[in-house]
């Protein structure tokens, strides 16, 4: 086997290799999951594997929020690119030059008021992916709370891998906050503080977290989780079958009613009256008409 080109730096990873004659003579296929595990293909598997560099860290911060910045127009950036750069500088040079991604696991946010508890002060929080153009689609999480209880806290499990080359990395995952009560505090004062904590990891691959228990990223395992396209569902149906929709009665199933201390009882939605009920009522009406007729006859005789 001969390596034609290998590029591995903080920009990209690329490997091109010519297969040896012993492999060319086999029925090797990259789509067969078991192929790479066979002894005769172990060399190929090792060549196309690469080191998995994964450095975990924790960032935390606390900021004071002036009352004039609580109208929703100001946001808090949760990723500090300068801090990430400092963290990368602590990694040994051989691995440092390969770092390409920052993975965000969990974001925790704690908001604490600077005023007494009990004051009605609703607050709206929106966590956004600010890289997206559509405002609605950029929403990761939306929360509503009230600082009359003194504190608000929420956790968001992000599981995002971001490229360190992103122009907006510092402004990518942001927290918008909006005080819903106006004319609450004089300008120049601070209504609350925001403390945040982020679990993160720096890596050389977008897939590093998936291999966090392993020192290598193996090509066969990397592609084993990719969605496999199956034949269309309608492939076994005739054209008429696939296009036909069978109507079903609206009230096809009985309703189930639960009564306290009683067994489950089934009742249909529309239950037609019994035939004997109809006969009984009809006979009663006939009897009443007959009685009235007789009374009229008796009155005529008296007159």
Curated annotation (Swiss-Prot):
GO biological process annotation, one example: transport of virus in host, cell to cell
GO cellular component: host cell plasmodesma
Cellular compartment(s): Host cell junction, Host plasmodesma
Highest taxon listed in the record's lineage: Viruses
Coiled coil: 272-302
Main location: host cell
Subunit structure: Homotrimer, through the coiled-coil domain. Interacts with VAP.
Record function comment: Transports viral genome to neighboring plant cells directly through plasmosdesmata, without any budding. The movement protein allows efficient cell to cell propagation, by bypassing the host cell wall barrier. Acts by forming tubules structures that increase the size exclusion limit (SEL) of plasmodesmata, thereby allowing viral ribonucleocapsids to spread directly to neighboring cells.
Family, similarity comment: Belongs to the caulimoviridae movement protein family.
Name of the protein in question: Movement protein
Organism of origin: Soybean chlorotic mottle virus
Taxonomic classification: Viruses, Riboviria, Pararnavirae, Artverviricota, Revtraviricetes
